A protein has these predicted regions:
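Acetyl-CoA-dependent GNAT
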Residues: 2, 6, 16-106, 125, ...
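Glycine-rich phosphate-binding loop
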Residues: 113
């Protein structure tokens, strides 16, 4: 299996971000989210920034300590190789789906199976919080991520399309 050759999840860990790391990460996360929205053609850049800002404020209503919002550094030994944002709702039995809001493997670590291994670790983290499924959104133009999620067994549950006139 390719994962065994490139990277096994046992060689990679997810470490909770420190407050200082979160403070550094949050502006980059917000900018990246706004850029993805605008790049998808869903809306102009100014509207994308407004949406990203509102969505982020809603998700992180209590800042770093917001319950159910988990952000990890993807660690390859002692080296930070990226980050992963996982949301797990409270113990409500009607809300047992965790959500991967974002994952990013740093450029120097790409192409080595780190994203795959981190997603497998995220599945375990979600299970440890009582989740029975894990969802995510992927922008249509992100073909590398779409291929990864397909190979991990994620099913398409919605598809949004647009045609410029």
């Amino acid at each position: 299996m390719e994962l065994d050759v490139l990277m096994s999840e046992s060689e990679l860990t997810l470490r909770p971000m420190t407050r200082a790391e979160w403070d550094e990460w949050m502006p980059r996360q917000l900018a990246g989210y706004a850029r993805h929205i605008a790049d998808s053609g869903a809306m102009p850049e100014a509207e994308a920034w407004a949406k990203a800002t509102a969505d982020t404020a809603r998700s992180w209503h209590a800042g770093y300590a917001t319950p159910g919002q988990l952000v990890f550094r993807i660690m390859a030994g002692d080296e930070a190789a990226g980050w992963l944002w996982l949301a797990v709702p409270g113990p409500d039995p009607d809300r047992l789906m965790g959500w991967v809001y974002n994952i990013e493997v740093d450029p120097a670590f790409r192409g080595r199976g780190y994203g795959r291994a981190a997603m497998i670790l995220a599945e375990g983290e979600a299970r440890s919080h009582g989740m029975t499924s894990l969802g995510l959104n992927v922008h249509g133009q992100n073909t590398v991520a779409r291929s990864l999620y397909d190979s991990l067994g994620y099913d398409v549950t919605a598809l949004q399309m647009k045609k410029p006139l």
